[in-house]
Amino acid sequence: MINEILQKSEKKMSASLDVLLQELSGIRTGRSSPALVEHIRVEYAGVPTPINHLANISAPDPRYITIQPWDRSCLSAIEKAIMKSDLGLMPNNDGNIIRLNIPPLSEERRQEMIKIVNKRLEEDKIAMRNVRRDAMDEMKKLEKAKEISQDDLKRGSDQLQKITDNFIAKADKLGADKEAELRQV
């Protein structure tokens, strides 16, 4: 029973870490990457849709990203979505393709991005701690109902803490790597 709770918690924490990784890949570092804009949602046919579902995104060189929609009618919607995003990019629409110039980051913008990284990292850690809390509550209910012993509760609690510490360490490493990438000039 405890193993099921631990496995469920581990899956949830792993999913949370995957979301963090996806969010961090979308934070601008001064180099072009399709991941920078893939997550941006465009209002298309009344439904928020990720750009990568509407267009081909490529990075032909380190300073440009090109977005070529499969349906030209969504060009202006993609352009608006990029302008609304917190990336600070100005799209250049030529009627067929949207080009994004990726300027080098100013020191001020680097600091803003580092704050965003730290904010997302903290949100992820909170989510992991909430998973831990929920799992602990489940185990305590089982102990109260006399389905597991106090020793089992203690062992499960210790294992859960190790799992949580492991995932938080992984999240910290992702955050530190992204911060180091942002600090490179």
From Swiss-Prot:
Sorted UniProt keywords: Cytoplasm, Protein biosynthesis
Swiss-Prot/TrEMBL GO biological process terms: translational termination
Cited InterPro entries: Ribosome_recyc_fac, Ribosome_recyc_fac_dom, RRF_sf
Gene Ontology CC annotations of this record: cytoplasm
Protein name in the entry: Ribosome-recycling factor
A GO molecular-function descriptor: ribosomal large subunit binding
Its job: Responsible for the release of ribosomes from messenger RNA at the termination of protein biosynthesis. May increase the efficiency of translation by recycling ribosomes from one round of translation to another.
Stated family: Belongs to the RRF family.
Mitochondrion among keywords: no
Any Pfam family the entry gives: RRF
The keyword Protein biosynthesis appears for this protein: yes
Organism, as annotated: Dehalococcoides mccartyi (strain CBDB1)
Location(s) in or outside the cell: Cytoplasm
Top-level division of the source organism's lineage: Bacteria
